[in-house]
Amino acid sequence: MSKPTREEATEAVRTLLKFIGEDPSREGLLQTPDRVINSYVEIFSGYGKDVAEILNTKFYETCNFQDFILLNIKFTSFCEHHILPFNGTVDIAYIPDNCIVGISKLARIVNIFARRLQIQEKMTVQIAESVQENLKPLGVAVKISAVHSCMSMRGVMQDNSVMNTMHYTGIFAEQQKYRHEFLNLTAKR
């Protein structure tokens, strides 16, 4: 599949405007197709980014960390089913084996995966598995809590529903006490 040109993408937006009953040549909509394409370039900038590159700078520490937890990383993504936004928070914990990364790197990983068409379940796994693969910690725990526009703007029209997904690797998957501690910490907000 070849990537459409910017002009083809802009024309597709004009076609969608016509489809919903709008006139793309009216004054308020003249620049809308270009604005939509510019927005999409930014919103979906996670494609082509390499998580391994982000996690390249590691700190090899001799101190013995019990665990490392970063809570409340905010994100907005778009569901691949309706191309509507879902937004929420990501909590990440890992138990280092011999290296750690700066905390901003974890937020950058979230942004890479959030800036793609997604489903929350897959994004949860992608974040956890990328930390596991690149840092090789004893275990990783990831929890995502999000509100989905596809539930609030259409269909069942439930605007207060929050979806929670979790994924565990290593010691978090193997030992309940680590999962329990992680879930207790994430629930205290």
UniProtKB/Swiss-Prot annotation:
Reactions the enzyme catalyzes: GTP + H2O = 7,8-dihydroneopterin 3'-triphosphate + formate + H(+)
EC nos: 3.5.4.16
This protein's UniProt keywords: GTP-binding, Hydrolase, Metal-binding, Nucleotide-binding, One-carbon metabolism, Zinc
Enzyme class: hydrolase
Record's keyword annotation contains Transmembrane helix: no
Cellular component, GO annotation: cytoplasm
Sites where the protein binds Zn(2+): C79, H82, C150
One BP term from GO: tetrahydrofolate biosynthetic process
MF terms in GO: GTP binding; GTP cyclohydrolase I activity; zinc ion binding
Keyword Zinc assigned: yes
Pathway: Cofactor biosynthesis; 7,8-dihydroneopterin triphosphate biosynthesis; 7,8-dihydroneopterin triphosphate from GTP: step 1/1
PROSITE patterns reported in the protein's UniProt record: GTP_CYCLOHYDROL_1_1 (PS00859), GTP_CYCLOHYDROL_1_2 (PS00860)
Family of the protein in this entry: Belongs to the GTP cyclohydrolase I family.
Quaternary assembly: Homomer.
Protein name: GTP cyclohydrolase 1
Source organism (scientific name): Rickettsia africae (strain ESF-5)
Gene from which the chain derives: folE
